[in-house]
Amino acid sequence: MTYDPIALLSHGLIDLPWWGYVVVTLALTHVTIASVTIFLHRAQAHRALDLHPVVSHFFRFWLWLTTGMVTKEWVAIHRKHHAKVETEDDPHSPQTRGIDTVMWKGAELYRAESKNHETLEKYGRGTPDDWMERNIYTRFSWHGVGLMLAVNLALFGPIGATIWAVQMAWIPFWAAGVVNGLGHYWGYRNFASADTSTNLVPWGFVIGGEELHNNHHAYGSSAKFSSRWWEFDLGWTYIRILAFLRLATVRKVAPKLHLENAKPTPDLTTLHAVITHRYEVATSYGRELKALLAAELGKLRERAQRGEIKPVEVPSIWRLRRWLATEPAALPAPERARLSAMLAASKPLAKVYAMREELSGVWARSTESSEQLLARLQDWCRRAEGSGIEALARFSFQLKRYA
């Protein structure tokens, strides 16, 4: 077989129609997405699954070719993000660094933190440290992307450079920008985790399931990111296929909430279930009180219009429920100020918010014994049922069904 040198220069070894190059680009970038979410994120950073050595090394090699990222660096930075989430020490929180910075300069934040030796030593333990990792993937971390460019040019000609450029931008935009930025700024929340994480959309196709960021922050060690029947995690689908082929072993998934007939009073089983599902509890609290919250917000607006109280910036019911489902420290300062002003103007809202804070104290007081925490939960339920607020009584009844 002979090759025309001019043809090789114009379209490389493989000549495709325009849409063929689009398909190739999407396929290559999707393998990179799968490598990040399955290998780097779920297997390495959170130990949610074990991968067969062949699969693991394929992912390592592919990430070396397409991103230049070092496994230890990525894992350490991500673990630090979870440990220091929404604080000044969080490597990429839009709450402290600004959404524009994280969205468009996320890769720069990653590179800066990767030079922090303390971060790598403290949070990067347990990552691959074999000969290939030390002498190839880490020592020549950026040579892989150069090899990828050469391969693309040989296969596709000049258009290969465009494909390569898209490959280089894919993870910095979708992972470092969209997930780390928008995933803590915009979207919906299933769980009231102690941060501002959100689910971007219910269907995790484009970023392999990483779109379900709030679910992940609620149960960080779970190999499965979807939690509601209408949600879809493509990364989990791949993991199940690998497990079926005996190429992966799932170590942990998020626990499922079990309900039984309500008990007269909470017991230790109830307590443990409440602590395990604490983020679900906090979210359900706002959902159960939705009608009460809406009614009180309406009263605030009417009183402000009549001049009975100082005008307050009354939030939407959606925003108020989100405030109830977020720890105060995780709220931006302007929103905390709005919340304080609103609570000062409404005793019922102040009451339900204070009860919410007391309930979260049940799982926040790690130094107390189980018996002490159980006494707190039992007391909370008694006061909720005797508060005269029907929604609180209903919620207490619901808690006593936890098992």
Predicted regions and their residues:
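Alpha-helical architecture
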Residues: 39-40, 80, 170, 182-185, ...
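Active-site-proximal inter-transmembrane loops
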Residues: 124-131, 186-212, 216-219
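Non-catalytic, topology-defining segments of multipass membrane proteins
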Residues: 1-178, 222-403
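A cytosolic-side transmembrane-helix exit/cap motif
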Residues: 43-44, 181-191
